[in-house]
Every structure is written in C-alpha cells, then in structure tokens.
C-alpha cells in the first residue's frame, strides 16, 4: 500500500540547490547597458556606471587636524619648553599668505592649510599663551596633528568603482572630489503581478475562501528599495490564456517580470505552462524551505522570476534568488549580503538535502548574542517575518542543530530597507 505523505516537502525528487540556481542566474542574465547622467541630489541608490577617477588629491593640501599652533619641528627645544612669538593666523579657507619664518608660531585652526615652512601642530590644550608668545611643551613628534594631501584619496585613484550602489558616503566622496553629476545605469523597469482566483485587492469585499493580496505590496516595496521602476499589473486569474496575454504584454515594455503564485504543480497553477508557451523555462523547483516552487525563465527575451504564493516563501525566495537576479540585471557588483555567525539558541531537526531558512530574532545571553527561532514555521505566517530580525540558514547537509552551534544569520537589515 502506498505511503501517504504528511510533509509537502517529502516528494522533492531531483531539485536544484539555490547555489545552482544562482549560478544559472549569473550565466543567463546580462545587465542593462543604458546609462543616464543625474545630479548628486538624486543619485542615492543608483548604480554607478563608470569608475570615478580622482582628478585631485583628497585632502587637496596638507592641513591641520586640530586647533593649535603650527611650527617647524626643528625650531623646538627637545628637553624644555620653547617660547615662540605668534606672528600669523591660518583658518579653514583663509590660509596664511606667506611662508612661515624660522622661530615663529602660526595660530592655526582645524582644516586650515599648513603654512609653508611648518610641519607640526601643537594642540592649543597643550600650550600656554602670554604676552604674544606661546609656550610649547617638549616631546611632540615631528608631523604631529598634520593631515597630508592625498592621505584619503590620491589623484588617479579609482575613488568609486562602477557597479557600486550609491550610498550617502559615496555621494559625499564624489562631491568632495568635485563631481556634481554621476553616470549611472538607468533603473530597471519591472512588471509585477499576482495570480490567483482567490486573491483580492486590500479593501475590496472578501468572500468566503478569498484572501487579500499581501505579496504584491511586499514585492513592490522590495523592488522599489532596489531602485526599480515598478509597473503594478494587479491580480490575474488562474487561467493560462489570461496569464499568457499578461506576460506577453509585460515582456514588450519591461526588463524583468516578477510574479507570485501559480508556480506549483496544481491544476490551477499556470505560470509555469504560460512561460513554456511563450519562451523558455530554466528551472522551477528548488531544494529550499520555504519556497520550493520558484520559476526562472524568459518571455520574449525578458527574464521572469515566478515566486511562490505563500507570503513567507515569497520573502525568502525574493531575498535568496530574486534580489541577486535584480542586482545583476541592474549592473550592481559586490552586492552579496553579509552573513554573521551567531550561536543557535534553539535545537532543531531537518531533512538533509534541502537548505532551510528559519525566521529568528537576536537576543543577548550573557556576553553572547544568540539566535532564537520564531515559534511557528508555517510559510503563510507573515507575522513571523514582521517579528523576526532575520534568517538562520541551515545548509543542505545539516540534519540536526543543537543549542550553542554556530549558524549563519542573515539580518533583514542587510537585504530589506
């Protein structure tokens, strides 16, 4: 007699690992090539299309790191206080207009260009001043409190590499080097749609058996956070003909199509067959939990990623697969999120052969930080994402996790705005 399964993941068969799926994405997806020039004020989050080469040193000149007195170190008496007349003043943007003479001190302020003839700055807190003369204590090293031209960035350096997603510090560096505009890749145009006869827009009447569409709004936010221009194509019914029409229309005007729902093996799941009718399906089942049914294909030459219908599986598969696809397509490099080793504050058993992503929060336990698993594992429990800090990742080979074992932790802050 056949054994009935009580585990929806029991009949996995030969499934792709997420590493294999990511390699497929790397091989099959080519970045956009169109660029545009934008002012710094609106460049945050955009992908830099060309290296920024420094055309100047940063800082552009030697300058003082503190408020104090600039002197020539050779003029200081090694074993006792040195008294010097203060004969000039240098402030940021108002440098001394002559070389400093031997045996004199120049009053200097933070950021001011070092006067010619000086090489050391004595902090004002370490000095005594009386009757126009400053007393400088012995023992200061030559070059103290002096910032050198080019110690941050040297002329000719690659200050920012192409492929960088521009953050606030990047824009500051670009501005400090005199750039008012930057060449960036144009934003991706992404078509987004949900599938399912049971799915309704929020606020609409909700008949028995229907649910409100959470996925489209989560995905829209995640896509916008990656700088995409999103076309919301709404909810499409569970009919192959309707999906074929929607996908064909979307492929004509977009760089990427993202769907949720309809990628499993049920009689009402038609995304897979629609993609096969219109183009090519590269894969559609992965050895991960949650999120086994995930489709990657092409429709009219446009990449399509079909995500599951359960909202937790949508989040996990987006972060694991869709996000790398989008960053590659957008021209971004070095976008792999950081994983952090933490101690497991829980025990857990899993089936070998699939990678699992467990929702967890970080808690302090003595001097250590531990990951505590959310109590319920269901792929439809959206509140588990809201109330967790990130995902504990258990590799395919793992079968049992004991308390105190080091695990990889992916914070949501690394991958979600």
Placement of each model-derived feature along the sequence:
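Structural signal for hydrophobic packing residues in well-ordered secondary-structure cores
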Residues: 26-33, 51, 114, 157-163, ...
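Flexible glycine/proline-rich
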Residues: 19-22, 36-41, 50, 93, ...
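Short, low-complexity N-terminal leaders and the immediately following helix N-cap/first helix
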Residues: 1-81, 333-357
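Helix-rich terminal scaffold detector
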Residues: 1-19, 180-307, 311-317
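Short, glycine/charged-enriched hinge/interface segments at domain edges or termini
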Residues: 2-13, 52, 69-232, 368, ...
